[in-house]
Amino acid sequence: EPAPKGAIPEDFTAPTQPTSALSFSPPPLRERDMWGITIFDQLMCRIDFNRLNYEGRYTPPSLKGTIVYPGNFGTFNWGSIAVDPQRQVMFGMPTYLAFTSRLVPRADIPPKGEGEKASEQGLNRNEGAPYGVVMGPFLGKLKVPCQAPPWGYVAGADLTTGQIAWKHRNGTVRPTAGPAPVRNAVT
C-alpha cells in the first residue's frame, strides 16, 4: 500500500509498504477519535493530535513529533499469538494504543546518566545515529490515553479463510470515575 513521505533529509522512505492478507491493523486515527476523562482533556488531546505529524500507519518520524499507531506495544508485539495447526485458527491480543515519537538531533541529547537504562518510554539515544528519539504513549494531560477505548481486543482468526472470526474488546472504562462523584459515559 502507498506510504507517506516526509522523512528527515538524512532518511529514506519507501513509496509503498507490504501488507498481509490477514490483518489486524486498525483503521487510521481521526481527530474525532480523541478522548479524555473531561471535555478539557479531550480538547487538549485534539490539539495535540493536530499538532503532531500523522498520515496513517507508516508516518515517518519527525523533529516536530509523530503519532505512531498502532504504537510500540503492538498490534501483536507484546500480546503475541497462539496457533492451533489442526483447526487452522489463531488467537491473539491485538493492542491499539497510540504512541508518539520525536526525533532529537545528536547535539541536543544530554550526556548519558549513570545507571541509565533503555525503555519503551523516554529518550532512546540510538548511539551512533544522527538522531535519538523520545517515545511514549499518546496520553492526555491527566495521563489517560488520548484515543477512545477500546485499546485492544482478544481475537481469533480462521487461517483457512484469512478472516477475523471473533473479537472481544479490551480497554474499556466503566461508567464511574472511582470515588469521584462524576459519572463517566464511556463503557
Give the label of every model feature segment:
Residues 1-187:
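Noncatalytic, solvent-exposed loop/strand surfaces
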